Amino acid sequence: MDLKSKIRQIEGFPKEGISFKDITTVLKEGEALQYVTDQLTEQLKDLNIDIIVGPEARGFLVGTPVAYKLGVGFVPVRKPGKLPAETLTYEYELEYGTDSLQIHKDSIRPGQRVAIVDDLLATGGTVLATAKMVEALGGQVVSMNFLIELTGLKGRDILKGYEIKSLVEYEF
């Protein structure tokens, strides 16, 4: 399948100079959604994954069906104040300021083999924060898998040491 033909690009969204990669066009088409799920599952099937972790919000949409196909659970990583039980918070740097993410403290058991699945790898900040929380809880991040990678933003550079795979690459 020509997956790039299924991803809508919107120029100037959310601001001028950005070419937004809209995956709702993939999600609404059953064949494309199955293809993405099958391809991500194929990347992970031999890694003995115990659990999938997905960052808010599109990581939920991509990661949950992969977890289902692998027969493992799914753990959401959310913005602060969105998870009801005791959480671990990780604050990370943005170009101008900081942001933070949270995960339930009881969501990862020590020694669990974790795959982080998300829709997009850009600068790598969100997925690195996610990995740091998983590791703080004792999990082992064995793979990071993405539908889209924006290679020009060099997210891989801050993720050295992690296994990274993506289905589609764009420069920006």
Swiss-Prot record:
The UniProt record lists the EC number as 2.4.2.7
Which class of enzymes does this protein belong to? transferase
Q: Which SUPFAM superfamilies match?
A: PRTase-like
List, alphabetically, the InterPro entries matched: Ade_phspho_trans, PRibTrfase_dom, PRTase-like, UPRTase/APRTase
Nucleotide-binding keyword on record: no
Keyword flag Ribonucleoprotein: no
Q: Which GO terms describe its molecular function?
A: adenine binding; adenine phosphoribosyltransferase activity; AMP binding
What chemistry does it catalyse, as a reaction equation? AMP + diphosphate = 5-phospho-alpha-D-ribose 1-diphosphate + adenine
Q: Mind listing the UniProt keywords for this protein, alphabetically? A: Cytoplasm, Glycosyltransferase, Purine salvage, Transferase
Question: Major place of localization?
Answer: cytoplasm
Q: Name one GO cellular component term.
A: cytoplasm
Alphabetized Pfam families for the sequence: Pribosyltran (PF00156)
Tell me which Gene Ontology terms the entry assigns under biological process: adenine salvage; AMP salvage; purine ribonucleoside salvage
Quaternary arrangement and interactors, per the entry? Homodimer.
Function, as annotated, reads: Catalyzes a salvage reaction resulting in the formation of AMP, that is energically less costly than de novo synthesis.
Family to which the UniProt record says this protein belongs: Belongs to the purine/pyrimidine phosphoribosyltransferase family.
What protein am I looking at?
Answer: Adenine phosphoribosyltransferase
Species annotation: Alkaliphilus oremlandii (strain OhILAs) (Clostridium oremlandii (strain OhILAs))
